[in-house]
Amino acid sequence: MLTTLLIELLDRIRRPWVPLLGAALLSGCSSLDYYGQLARGQLALLHARQPVQALIDDPAQPQVLRQRLALTQQARTFASDSLGLPDNGSYRVYADIQRPYVVWNLFATPEFSLQPQTHCFPIAGCVAYRGYYQLGRARGAAALLRQQGLETWVGGVEAYSTLGWFDDPLLNTMLRWNDDRLAALIFHELAHQQLYVPGDTAFNESFASFVEREGLSQWRASRGLATRGDEDARRRDALTRLVLDARERLQRLYASGFPPERMRQAKAEEFERLRRDYRVMRDRDWGGYNRFDAWMEGPMNNAKLLPFGLYDQWIPAFAALFREAGGNWQAFYRRAAELGEMPQQERTRALESLAANR
């Protein structure tokens, strides 16, 4: 969820020094100050947790909060009972962290490249961002990277998964979503607990996104709700295709060998083309629906384009795998895990073959 949704490995080990190790696994930053802010942020999150059922049963709590939390528990039970996702304490506790995002992720690229600045570690593999619990720290780190000639983008994250090592809480940042999106987010994060392949973000996010989508369809059916035409999902998919097309053009430009000034001018023209194509699509196909205007019309650079495509690249492949498994979740998870055990090049070929047979 993204989005939405990119830090995945804090608290991997049940020991007092886990925040420091988790920070190292994710961030790639050698600064003890950086480790310290992650440790403090994660410990504050753990300290803020409360049992969801106690809040639901407390008449002193706002009725709207109690109703939303009750819905999350129905979705949480469905996730384990019907989707075969891990049955543990995650999302049966709640934390109000008093801010709009749980972390802010910082992405960075060179001026003429779409290759992210990455940080690689034995368990987490390589990740293309660093996470900060305070927006000011993320912006400060971004400023330092820009002084080194890198382009940066900072994006807020509503939730992340600790992959089952601790009981991940529901967060106030998650409750602003509508009922379907809230249930889908729970399915997505639990899917990361079900299967995670170090160093392969596209695989992990596509797997979780497929479980989210198929799980939401089954969740709605279980509640007697009609299958919906997900206009929001179609718009997101269309926007993603638009951005990926722009990325392909930029990659060709950066490989051209043009002098820097010419490349800089052509790059600016590509970003303006992206905005122009977006406006046409918005007005022609979406009836003026402007949810993405602020993102599109804001400052644009390579780093801002990095997250696109990560969440859906292999969804067609996982959909084909689910059909091959006869719609049986446990069989699907076993086959997905087998893919995850392959060397990355072999795994990519297998996913490409599955996607071709969708």
Annotate each language-model stretch with its function:
Residues 2-18:
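Bacterial N-terminal signal peptides that target proteins for export
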Residues 27-28:
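C-terminal motif of bacterial Sec signal peptides marking the signal peptidase cleavage site
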Residues 34, 45, 49-52, 180, ...:
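Metalloprotease/metallohydrolase-associated module, dominated by Zn2+-dependent proteases
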Residues 35-64:
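Post-signal peptide N-terminal segment of mature Sec-exported envelope proteins
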Residues 45, 58, 65-72, 131-138, ...:
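Solvent-exposed, acidic/flexible segments
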Residues 57-61, 70, 74-84, 191-195, ...:
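Sec-exported extracytoplasmic/periplasmic mature domains
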Residues 75-236, 247:
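Acidic/His-rich structured neighborhood in mature extracellular/periplasmic domains
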Residues 244-358:
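Pan-zinc metallopeptidase signature
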